[in-house]
């Protein structure tokens, strides 16, 4: 059984070649997503706060939350998806929890996150 597991982990390691910057929950990130409309393809930026991260090798994902026209929008991205063109960190947030789901219940200034100062 371990031989098969080695093959799977080797194949996953080959596919996880994308360079993604280190970011954590609380950070504000800009995710450039490839969007296909008809036969055209363009990049769409999704900027928001990372409220959760799931580290599972090839199956890693992260959730980004933003407020768009007064409505909270959350989007979960597969970290190594081919639809993600790039991820850039705009600012580092200083939080103590791994999952920031409590931000869903907050609005306005209460939902702000303190910036990390180093």
Curated annotation (Swiss-Prot):
NCBIfam families: rplS_bact
Gene Ontology CC annotations of this record: cytosolic large ribosomal subunit
Pfam families (UniProt xref): Ribosomal_L19
Recorded family membership: Belongs to the bacterial ribosomal protein bL19 family.
Entry superkingdom: Bacteria
HAMAP family: Ribosomal_bL19 (MF_00402)
Classification via InterPro entries: Ribosomal_bL19 (IPR001857), Ribosomal_bL19_CS (IPR018257), Ribosomal_bL19_sf (IPR038657), Translation_prot_SH3-like_sf (IPR008991)
UniProt-recorded name of the protein: Large ribosomal subunit protein bL19
Function text: This protein is located at the 30S-50S ribosomal subunit interface and may play a role in the structure and function of the aminoacyl-tRNA binding site.
Gene Ontology BP, a term: translation
UniProt keywords, alphabetically: Ribonucleoprotein, Ribosomal protein
GO molecular function terms attached to this record: structural constituent of ribosome
